[in-house]
Amino acid sequence: MLKGKTVVLGVTGSIAAYKIANLASMLVKKHANVHVIMTENACNFINPITFETLTGNKCLVDTFDRNFQFNVEHVSLAKLADIFLVAPASADVIGKIANGIADDMLTTTIMACKCPKLISPAMNTNMFTNPIVQDNLKKLEHYGYEIIQPDSGYLACGDTGAGKMPSEQVLLNYILRTIAKDKDMTGIKLTVTAGPTREKLDPVRFLSNNSTGKMGYAIAKMAMLRGADVTLISGKVSLEPVPFVKIVDIVSAEDMYNAVIKSAKDADIIIKAAAVADYRPSYVSDEKIKKKDGDMSIPLERTKDIIGTLGSSKRDGLFLCGFSMETEHMLDNSKVKLTKKNLDMIVANNVKVAGAGFGTDTNVVTVITKDAVEELPMMSKEEVADALLDRIMKARQ
């Protein structure tokens, strides 16, 4: 995902410095070209050799090191960088950058950078809330730096409060959001549904399906990385939340209907990837239904047709994409649904095909519009999501 991208990590003197070794490793695994610049104080917390081993690049500390790779190293690395993250960022280095003081390799390099720059403060709570530090952070924001707010919790000094550097995964998420994809969806409001619904039978039982939400979550993630303003309406799943998106948790088909209709009011694109129940029990027992001799019949009633409602009153400028999971007659059934529901696109797959369906990390889909039918090869669900977004963006032109 970061192949061909250069990430510069600036590490300052903080006990949290050791965590950046893991971040560097995570970035390398995503095929980024990672360079680390350390302050002299940072070397008291972690050895530069650690970063050199993990990244395969020399860790820079001394501005006047004669064994450099580039002619003017801080300038050439600044030109090479696609993103510069200072983490952990001490109060000292924050103050220097905010006030134009460039007296070491880290500060001189970041001053020469024109790429996106992120600052992740990490320090004692009283230091972080100090008006001088806060003024410096506001000044950096004014100059286009993005400040990653610290977490609150138990700090190395023994205090509890704000000042804790976020996890490596959070820092990685910020980097991915900034440079992983071209921002061709900036300004677009996209709503995607994901996961199953649960239709209550009694206080302990419900009717549901095997949807894990992986496809919908992949769509939300890739749209976010491409700059879209994403609303993810999700049933009960066991997936990590997608960062930087609005998540609306629902349980039943009725919940899903209400959430989608509300979100549709200002959406540009709606992708219905959730597996919504077509039927629900006509009666919900207030008490647990007891086992008795003989069989039991449960009367069912239709739930509201969410995408049908959207299609019947579709306004100009709204792009509607549905999903159709079938076990037989996939193309015929999906084409009927495309027309009947007044959709712009439908994504069909057969749950019986290997690599497709619920719970897998891959999918095999056929993209159907009024004018074309396109079979896509087996891909990861993130790759499928990207391919779908490509086709939606092209169709909207």
Residue ranges and their predicted role:
Residues 1-118, 124-213, 217-397:
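A cross-family phosphate/adenosyl-ligand binding-site feature
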